[in-house]
A protein has these predicted regions:
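Macrodomain-like recognition of ADP-ribose-binding/processing modules
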Residues: 1-82
Length: 82
């Protein structure tokens, strides 16, 4: 079971960031931000867990995107994630 470890309210007073302990693939969230290699090959760590739980569609979408320079970001669907 996930538990909130800490949280902060941003200066705009409309946003809250929560630090939560638990399985990131089981949380209903707006987005997951995950560090990845430039070729978007999700073969280990958090990236692998996301693809295993969310489905191969996440890797397939990443393959279509291809190379991503360091410091840039991309968006995929969540697959079967909540």
């Amino acid at each position: 079971m996930a538990a909130i470890v800490d949280q902060i309210r941003l200066e705009n007073k409309k946003s809250i960031i929560r630090l939560v302990a638990g399985d990131i693939t089981e949380r209903a969230v707006d987005a997951i931000v995950n560090a990845a290699n430039s070729y978007l090959k999700h073969g280990g760590g958090v990236a692998d867990a996301i693809v295993r739980k969310g489905g191969e569609i996440i890797q397939e979408e990443s393959d279509k995107i291809g190379f991503v320079p360091v410091g840039c970001s991309v968006i995929t669907t969540s697959g079967r994630l909540p």
